[in-house]
Swiss-Prot record:
Function text: One of the primary rRNA binding proteins. Required for association of the 30S and 50S subunits to form the 70S ribosome, for tRNA binding and peptide bond formation. It has been suggested to have peptidyltransferase activity; this is somewhat controversial. Makes several contacts with the 16S rRNA in the 70S ribosome.
Entries under InterPro entries matching the protein: NA-bd_OB-fold, Rib_uL2_dom2, Ribosomal_uL2, Ribosomal_uL2_bac/org-type, Ribosomal_uL2_C, Ribosomal_uL2_CS, Ribosomal_uL2_dom3, Ribosomal_uL2_RNA-bd_dom
Organism: Alkaliphilus oremlandii (strain OhILAs)
PROSITE patterns named among the record's database cross-references: RIBOSOMAL_L2
Ribonucleoprotein in keyword set: yes
One GO cellular component term noted in the UniProt record for this chain: large ribosomal subunit
Family to which this protein belongs: Belongs to the universal ribosomal protein uL2 family.
Pfam families tied to this protein: Ribosomal_L2 (PF00181), Ribosomal_L2_C (PF03947)
Protein name in the entry: Large ribosomal subunit protein uL2
Length: 276
């Protein structure tokens, strides 16, 4: 998908780029696969802010995506490639031969009219979903499950792909886009190929208004606040933060502080950590 640079009719638009949406074949989503989304504005059930800098997003519908790919042995035809406002990747509408319709993440190279299938006996071709046990070593994959039958959790963003490195007993060794190498149960399903919409990472937002449409509000620097609002706040004029290193609004180290649980059960599945 190509990127278009806008004419500099304003200072914001001088650097702004947008997608040309060449791969999109329709702007009318399948109504039976839509659900409403309630904008929480970053508040929990008590009305308190639990996530800062959220609110005011453009209203949108959620597209129900088939991450489980559990319709084994039933071929499906790609009917449309569509834009999804809830994710960076595009989505593809599948029409199964038994009449059911489902959305999947659109892989790179998938076109309208292509046939896809899932199950252990499916062919090794883009868009097909198979257990890791049935995928050849070295294959590029995406939409990977972490528990068999739970649905894909890994490698779902635009342009991403992982590589199946080896198979050892009940586990498969997979290298993720972050360069982390980890074991996954060999019965977990994955989809062949790379996630589409590769050019997404090259889009320049350009202006604050586009971020507001995404539901992201401004981030105020801690040093611009009062001392009762942030540990960096206070002082006369522009002063230093008065600490050895920056901290969060709650006093925890802001840079390089590991937040992952050292006793997490899945730690033993990680062979090598990602490169910083």
């Amino acid at each position: 998908m190509a990127i278009r640079k806008l004419k500099p009719t304003s200072p914001a638009k001088r650097q702004m780029t947008v997608s040309t949406f060449e791969e999109i074949t329709t702007n009318q989503p399948e109504k039976s696969l839509l659900e409403p989304i309630k904008n929480s504005g970053g508040r929990n059930s008590y009305g308190r802010i639990t996530v800062r800098h959220r609110g005011g997003a453009q209203k949108r519908h959620y597209r129900i995506i088939d991450f489980k790919r559990n319709k084994d042995g039933v071929p499906a035809k790609v009917a449309t490639i569509e834009y999804d406002p809830n994710r960076s990747a595009n989505i593809a509408l599948l029409h199964y031969v038994d009449g059911e319709k489902r959305y999947i993440i659109a892989p790179q190279g998938l076109k309208v009219g292509d046939m896809v299938e899932s199950g252990p006996n499916a062919d090794i071709k883009t868009g097909n979903a198979l257990p890791l046990a049935n995928i050849p070593v070295g294959t590029m994959i995406h939409n990977i499950e972490m528990k068999p039958g739970k649905g894909a959790q890994l490698v779902r963003a635009a342009g991403n792909s992982a590589q199946l490195m080896a198979k050892e007993g009940k586990h498969a060794l997979v290298r993720l886009p972050s360069t982390e190498v980890r074991y996954l149960p060999i019965d977990c399903k994955a989809t062949i190929g790379q996630v589409g919409n590769q050019e997404h990472e090259n889009i320049t937002i350009g202006k604050a208004g586009r971020k507001r449409n995404m539901g992201i509000r401004p981030t105020v620097r801690g040093s611009a606040m009062n001392p009762n609002d942030h540990p960096h706040g206070g002082g006369e004029g522009r002063t230093s933060i008065g600490r050895p290193a920056p901290v969060t609004p709650w006093g925890k180290p802001a840079l390089g502080y590991k937040t992952r649980d050292s006793k997490k059960a899945s730690n033993k599945m990680i062979v090598s950590r990602r490169k910083k």
